[in-house]
């Protein structure tokens, strides 16, 4: 029904409306869920235009013009329309404005937990209680729980995170005070145990969400991440400190980025030639790639960052075959 109604609207009118809503990326996320026509416009026109506007330097480096196109301005315009970044314009735009979230940054992986589950609690206890709106969305197969890695591959799947970010959720049944850290206030007396500190109940966004801070990418920041032998590779990541997630044990500064010509980079050769195993259960936060590689275990990151006393690396990062990077910084240990 929606297809037949909106197909009658002239495209110039649709474009005019869409670009008046470009200040908040979540507006396009909502519109992409209306019909396939709107989804196609958002993916192929709006995202491309906004990428050229927001990160022009990155685009010019990721998509260099061929010599024939650079010869004349008229042919370069036509050449631009035929060039597409790995993963598509929608994934690049999502990378520019979205934080990968705790799950896609690898912090909640079971095989690299480093004791975090004891501090944060099991993953299933962190999920908010489903609202009526969420249940309706699940029934219509619009999306799966954010961060679960089970998102649908429908035409709006790239926007599930932003769309879910806009759904107003009523306050939970428990009071706000119950969500704060509960500490036993009884007096310490001889012969009695010390007050027990109960686990904090936290409801956090595990998946991708609208990033805080500036929506730009910098090659200088990427150079600070890679080991010295990979300095010839071009990695753009968001400016420091990225999107800050405050946790009970330590703060995580989540970042995202993209490699230029990833399949021709030295990082990819190291991963491919070394037969590095893929990270189980961790998909890309920005495109439809189902597999990622751990740059830390592949020795592609600077060794100077080191580890915390519980074995957790100070910096971790994961890359998909399209060159999209998700990761997290933490504060350096004091003993270093």
Swiss-Prot record:
GO molecular function: ubiquitin-protein transferase activity
Pathway as given in its UniProt record: Protein modification; protein ubiquitination
InterPro entries: EID1-like, F-box-like_dom_sf, F-box_dom
GO cellular component, one term: nucleus
The F-box domain, residue ranges: 3-55
Subcellular location: Nucleus
Motif position, Nuclear localization signal: 197-201
Chain coiled-coil ranges: none
Biological process, per Gene Ontology: leaf development; photoperiodism, flowering; protein ubiquitination; red, far-red light phototransduction; regulation of photomorphogenesis
Alphabetically ordered keywords of this record: Nucleus, Phytochrome signaling pathway, Ubl conjugation pathway
Record's subunit section: Probable component of an E3 ubiquitin ligase SCF complex. Interacts with SKP1A/ASK1 and SKP1B/ASK2.
Domain remark in the UniProt entry: The F-box domain is required for the interaction with SKP1A and SKP1B.
Note: 'Empfindlicher im dunkelroten licht' means sensitive to far-red light in German.
Function (record text): Component of SCF(ASK-cullin-F-box) E3 ubiquitin ligase complexes, which may mediate the ubiquitination and subsequent proteasomal degradation of target proteins. Negative regulator of the phyA signaling pathway that shifts the responsiveness of the phyA signaling system associated with hypocotyl elongation from red to far-red wavelength.
Protein name per the record: Phytochrome A-associated F-box protein
Organism field: Arabidopsis thaliana (Mouse-ear cress)
């Amino acid at each position: 029904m929606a297809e037949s109604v909106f197909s009658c609207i002239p495209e110039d009118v649709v474009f005019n409306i869409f670009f008046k809503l470009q200040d908040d990326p979540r507006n396009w996320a909502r519109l992409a869920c209306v019909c396939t026509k709107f989804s196609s416009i958002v993916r192929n026109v709006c995202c491309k235009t906004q990428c050229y506007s927001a990160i022009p330097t990155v685009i010019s480096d990721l998509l260099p013009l061929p010599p024939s196109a650079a010869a004349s301005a008229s042919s370069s315009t036509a050449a631009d329309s035929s060039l597409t970044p790995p993963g598509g314009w929608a994934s690049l735009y999502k990378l520019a404005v979205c934080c990968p979230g705790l799950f896609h940054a690898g912090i909640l992986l079971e095989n690299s937990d480093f004791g975090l589950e004891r501090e944060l609690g099991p993953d299933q206890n962190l999920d908010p209680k489903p609202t009526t709106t969420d249940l309706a969305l699940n029934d219509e197969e619009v999306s799966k729980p954010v961060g679960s890695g089970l998102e649908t591959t429908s035409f709006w799947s790239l926007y599930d995170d932003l769309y879910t970010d806009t759904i107003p959720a009523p306050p939970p049944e428990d009071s706000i005070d119950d969500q704060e850290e509960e500490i036993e206030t009884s007096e310490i007396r001889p012969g009695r145990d010390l007050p027990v500190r109960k686990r904090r109940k936290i409801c956090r966004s595990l998946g991708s969400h609208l990033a805080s801070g500036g929506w730009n990418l910098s090659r200088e920041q990427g150079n600070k991440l890679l080991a010295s032998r990979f300095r010839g590779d071009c990695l753009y990541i968001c400016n420091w400190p990225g999107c800050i997630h405050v946790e009970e044990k330590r703060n995580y500064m989540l970042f995202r980025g993209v490699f230029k010509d990833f399949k021709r980079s030295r990082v990819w050769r190291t991963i491919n030639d070394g037969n590095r195993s893929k990270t189980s259960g961790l998909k890309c936060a920005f495109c439809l790639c189902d597999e990622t590689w751990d740059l830390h275990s592949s020795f592609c990151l600077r060794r100077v960052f080191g580890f915390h006393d519980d074995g957790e690396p100070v910096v971790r990062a994961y890359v998909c075959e399209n060159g999209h990077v998700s990761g997290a910084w933490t504060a350096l240990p004091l003993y270093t």
